[in-house]
Regions:
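N-terminal strand-loop element at the rim of the active site
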Residues: 11, 19, 28-35, 47-105
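Glycosyltransferase donor-sugar binding loop
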Residues: 62, 222, 247-261, 277
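Carbohydrate-associated surface elements
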Residues: 184, 203
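Nucleotide-activated donor-binding/catalytic signature segment of Leloir-type glycosyltransferases, i.e.
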Residues: 261-282
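Short hydrophobic beta-strand element within catalytic cores of glycosyltransferases
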Residues: 317-320
Length: 401
């Protein structure tokens, strides 16, 4: 029988030590309508804080269904109504940045909505993600009148920050507490804005149980179709992987039309490839829990690798590119690293691991333990609550002085 690795009971399920009711505004510069790592982080951050008794509102873009959205955003997304604790502040546009194509809110109307919101709502603290991103995060730094926490996610050169560096630096002086999700994100931020950054990693939801063995004959890719995600490398490797293993490839998160064009360009026409596009959180967890392994063939500029820890939480082994952001998360006990962009190495690693169920089970169980010990959102939420508590205590002491 497959061994089931069960998540332990959280060490504390009580409320935060913050005595007075606290309301936190979580500011995200992207669109709620399009899946991405920062959006996912903010969503689970809000849930983790609410479990501790901290009220949250997520301030983020939203692209409702209609012709304008279809014209501005060719890729698939979710266009239903955001939940009640989400405050939509405007539409987004696609902006090439850091070898990716994020959907960033840039409209002037969003800036004025932020100003009105921060003047009228009673936030005790603002937590800004990617604080140097126009326009919502910059506007929040300008108009917030409460303690500010900022989390830096991106890794890479971030060379655009050289333009107006003194302006950005002046804005960052308004931040009371700087967080980076990884050492790579910290180094990238420190290059332009030296200072103290505490590393608080991306968290992951831990399923109650996970079978480390007995998986379906599927290989999983999760991510957008951005060039840096390495989907083209995996597609070039796939015909030989399929010939050796007989598995199916399931692609999640990437727009089906874009994947189809990429397959045509790489001359990969294989009936063993399923392109699922955007799926719900529940569907995504089911896919990861049942896959033989997850492949993360990114070419670079990854600060962390949330798809890796999601796989760990589901006891799913990983084959990933040997890039700094991934190598800091993946160990020899939880997966396999291969040179980025090396099709032959990817074929060999995936084929060998697919054929070795005992090794897959061992890697999956070790990854599950690592996720529970280091990346549980219950623990990350408590760390954030402690940071907030310290800042709010300082603010109260300053007001009383």
């Amino acid at each position: 029988m497959p061994h089931r690795v069960t998540a332990p009971t959280p060490r504390s399920t009580g409320r935060s030590h913050i005595l007075a009711p606290v309301k936190v505004g979580i500011v995200v510069p992207f669109s709620w309508s399009y899946w991405g790592g920062v959006n996912e982080h903010a969503f689970h951050q809000a849930r983790a804080l609410e479990k501790l008794g901290i009220e949250t509102r997520t301030i983020i873009g939203h692209d409702p269904p209609g012709l304008q959205t279809r014209l501005l955003h060719p890729r698939a997304g979710r266009h239903d109504r955001p939940p009640a604790d989400v405050i939509p502040i405007g539409r987004s546009v696609i902006v090439p940045a850091n070898a990716s194509l994020p959907n960033i809110v840039l409209s002037p109307s969003a800036i004025f909505r932020i100003r009105k919101l921060l003047r009228e709502d009673t936030f005790d603290l603002i937590h800004v993600h990617e604080p140097m991103t126009p326009a919502t995060c910059v506007a929040s730094l300008v108009w917030a009148r409460c303690p500010i926490v900022a989390t830096h996610h991106a890794a890479g050169d971030l060379g655009w920050l050289r333009y107006g560096q003194h302006f950005w630096g002046h804005l960052l002086q308004r931040v009371d507490y700087r967080i980076a999700v990884s050492e790579q994100a910290k180094l990238s931020a420190e290059r332009w804005f030296p200072g103290h950054y505490e590393i608080v990693p991306n968290g992951v939801q831990i399923p109650e149980t996970a079978d480390a063995g007995g998986r379906a004959a599927t290989i999983l890719f999760i991510g957008r179709h951005d060039a840096r995600k390495g989907l083209e490398v995996l597609l070039r490797a796939w015909p030989e992987i399929h010939r050796r293993t007989g598995t199916r490839l399931r692609i999640i998160g990437a727009d089906p039309l874009a994947v189809g064009l990429l397959m045509a360009r790489t001359h990969v026409h294989d009936a063993s490839i399923d392109v699922l596009g955007f799926v719900s959180e529940e569907e995504l967890t089911r896919e990861v829990e049942t896959a033989q392994l997850l492949v993360a063939p990114s070419l670079g500029q990854e600060s962390f690798g949330m798809v890796l820890t999601r796989a760990f939480a589901c006891a799913t082994p990983v084959v990933a590119s040997d890039i700094p952001g991934y190598a800091a998360v993946l160990t020899a006990e939880t997966g396999v690293l291969v040179p980025p962009g090396d099709v032959a190495a990817l074929v060999d690693a995936v084929s060998a691991l697919s054929a070795d169920e005992p090794r897959r089970r061992a890697l999956g169980e070790a990854g599950r333990r690592l996720a529970i010990e280091r990346y549980s959102w219950d623990d990350i939420g408590r760390r954030l609550a402690a940071i907030y508590e310290g800042l709010l205590a300082q603010a109260r002491a300053g007001s009383a002085a």
